[in-house]
């Protein structure tokens, strides 16, 4: 039987997630521009919701692309 090590949250609880912090947001987006799921990011459910909103806002303001077509 294998055991999985619990991932520590990369963002501290209570730390604000800002849509203008593009470097932070890119860590949670795939090469193709998709938002990574919570089981991979290791965030809490509230942090994941805030992150999703921040990424979507950032896309609307054109800080992040909707689709990364480089590949």
Swiss-Prot record:
Protein keywords: Ribonucleoprotein, Ribosomal protein, RNA-binding, rRNA-binding
SUPFAM superfamilies assigned: Ribosomal protein S18
Gene Ontology terms, MF aspect: small ribosomal subunit rRNA binding; structural constituent of ribosome
One GO BP annotation of this record: translation
Coiled-coil region: none
Annotated GO CC locations: cytosolic small ribosomal subunit
PANTHER family, per the entry: 30S RIBOSOMAL PROTEIN S18, SMALL RIBOSOMAL SUBUNIT PROTEIN BS18M
Similarity section: Belongs to the bacterial ribosomal protein bS18 family.
Described purpose of this protein according to its UniProt entry: Binds as a heterodimer with protein bS6 to the central domain of the 16S rRNA, where it helps stabilize the platform of the 30S subunit.
HAMAP family xref list: Ribosomal_bS18 (MF_00270)
Quaternary structure annotation from Swiss-Prot or TrEMBL: Part of the 30S ribosomal subunit. Forms a tight heterodimer with protein bS6.
Stated name of the protein: Small ribosomal subunit protein bS18
Organism: Nostoc punctiforme (strain ATCC 29133 / PCC 73102)
